[in-house]
Design a protein with these regions (language model features):
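A glycine- and Lys/Arg-enriched "phosphate-lid" helix/loop adjacent to the NTP-binding pocket
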Residues: 111-174
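ATP-binding Walker
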Residues: 23-24
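NTP-dependent small-molecule kinase module
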Residues: 2-9, 32-34, 147-217
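Walker A/P-loop
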Residues: 27
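Hydrophobic anchor at the beta1->P-loop junction of P-loop NTPases
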Residues: 18
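Post-Walker A helix-loop "phosphate-sensing" segment adjacent to the P-loop in P-loop NTPases
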Residues: 35-44
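ATP-dependent small-molecule kinase phosphotransfer cores
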Residues: 44-131
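Pre-Walker A (Motif I) flank of P-loop NTPase domains
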Residues: 11-15
Length: 217
């Protein structure tokens, strides 16, 4: 597993990213973090990929249907990667320049995880694109057994009948863990209590803000 050579954003703000399987518990963590940070900071919560990609035919085909023969997965990966790059420069970076704290629900790491989990481990183009992607101040990866994640997804009324490729979920979990380790991320097991998980997130965020604030002034 190669490390992504992302660019430092060099702004007054802070970028924190949250990645993991659907049902890993990241939404609970980032929602609570946003609420706490807003007491003292300007906070902007965003999501990748954007709705422009999420509502596209190719994205919905891969998310909701077992038959993927209509598309080459690379085409979706390229679409998602370009969307993340554009979103970073047009949405995230201006917020960081203002000194805001940006929390991103998923980030470029998810693009890499999905590409590799589908068998494209030797595709180097994604590493080239990563050079233009801003490096987070802290990247959180939330790990949970696949069965637990799927059970959580199925408990949502709108997704109880959603198609889920179980084999893919196992591969994705492995990729997320590898990407986290290769890129200096923070790995948190959401099998632990919500309180323990959140305390780990908050502790790291507070450490980063404290250590970097003077350097950014």
């Amino acid at each position: 597993m190669k490390k992504l050579d992302m660019k430092p954003h060099g702004t007054k703000g802070f970028l924190f990213t949250f990645c993991g399987l659907d049902g890993c518990g990241k939404t609970t963590m980032l929602t609570r973090l946003k609420s706490d940070l807003e007491k003292e900071h300007r906070v902007f919560l965003t999501k990748q990929p954007t709705n422009a990609v999420r509502t596209s035919d190719i994205f919905r085909t891969y998310m909701d249907c077992p038959d993927h023969d209509a598309y080459d997965y690379r085409s979706l990966s390229l679409l998602a990667a370009s969307d993340r790059l554009q979103h970073g420069s047009r949405v995230i970076e201006p917020r960081l320049n203002k000194g805001d704290i940006v929390i991103s629900d998923r980030y470029f790491y998810s693009c890499l995880a999905n590409l590799r989990a589908r068998g494209f481990e030797n595709d180097n183009w994604i590493y080239e694109i990563a050079r233009a992607v801003m490096k987070p101040d802290a990247a959180f990866f939330f790990d949970v057994p696949v069965e637990t994640a799927v059970k959580r997804v199925r408990s949502r009324a709108a997704e109880k009948n959603r198609y889920i490729d179980m084999d893919l979920q196992y591969r994705l979990r492995t990729e997320y863990i590898s990407i986290c380790k290769a890129n200096g991320g923070v790995l948190i097991s959401t099998e632990n209590s919500v309180e323990d998980c959140y305390n780990a997130v908050k502790k790291e965020v507070e450490r980063v803000i404290k250590n970097e604030t003077g350097k950014k002034d």
